[in-house]
């Protein structure tokens, strides 16, 4: 985990677990829900405080995207849910570009022509 501090604020970032936030506190008081030790140990991003929803948020019905006359089948990440949810950014490790005491930059590049193309048909880059 990457620990960042600024005055009374502390943020714990987990780039290897979907770019998720493990903790965000002010003077030791959680501002986001706490991430359990089990979620950190297992890498279960859904148990973290927050995680990025890229390249889309919420759900795409029946895990099928219709765009510009084409149809794209998307993965279903949650058992029992027939829809695609939250894109693939939360399923991927993010690359750490820079870390300082009070800031970090993490990056995710999705190349739609490579091995993970089935997850999203279009290239994108997300940075936080």
Predicted regions and their residues:
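Surface-exposed acidic/polar loop and edge beta-strand patches at domain peripheries
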Residues: 1-127
